[in-house]
Amino acid sequence: TANIARLLAKQGNKVFIIDADINTPSMNTEFEGDHPHEMIWVHSSGNMFSKFIYLEKSMVRQYLELAKKKIHSINPDYVLIDTPPSVTNVHIELLSRVKVSYVLFVTQPTKLSNQDVLRTMDFFHERCGKVNCGIVENMCYGTEHNEYPIRLVAQIPMQDNMNTENLLTNAYNEFQKIVDEIVQSDIVVLEEYSTENGYDENFDVTDIHITGSRKHYFTHELKY
């Protein structure tokens, strides 16, 4: 996520990063402060709750709501959401507030990692519908060939001694493939559902059945 943001910023785009790995944030170590670069803004729990080792649900909601306010204020060209490897309640909270236009699944070319990605894919398809998505293989040796149900966008090579300091330079072409994919997918990477400009009927219960003197509410579908 950090290197994609750096490359987008280098090409003149305003980038806002939401660190959705609440318990073990990393964007606060990748970047210094909330506005580390002229074109990059970082929203990380590592900056906001640096003295906490556990965040209550209300704090997570506060964190996500503040992210939405920052989007209004910054008006970025791209919003990148860095998520933990496994699905958490934060994913569910986040997807109840936002609509994503592209999901990038990062995996390693191993059987176990591939299985995890396939399970995560099912979750996002259920929550996001038919959204554009792709796979990035990380820590590759260039000899493996894996089949995926969606497009393989890029393969990031294994670095000597696991040193990722110059990763963007060493794998520039692969990161450019990712950026090209994101740029072509949609003009807006993330948009929020809002009632700010009036009542939003997307949140309506689509069917209510009333029987006799008692009211029974059957929710057939909730549009998020």
Give the positions of each predicted feature.
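Conserved catalytic-core segment of NTP-binding enzymes
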Residues: 70-74, 78, 84-161
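Walker A/P-loop NTP-binding active-site region of P-loop NTPases
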Residues: 1-38, 78
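A short helix-to-beta-strand connector/capping loop
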Residues: 35-44, 131, 151
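Glycine-rich, phosphate-binding/catalytic loops in enzymes
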Residues: 33, 59-61, 96-99
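Amphipathic alpha-helical transducer elements in NTP-driven molecular machines
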Residues: 57, 61-65, 111-118, 168, ...
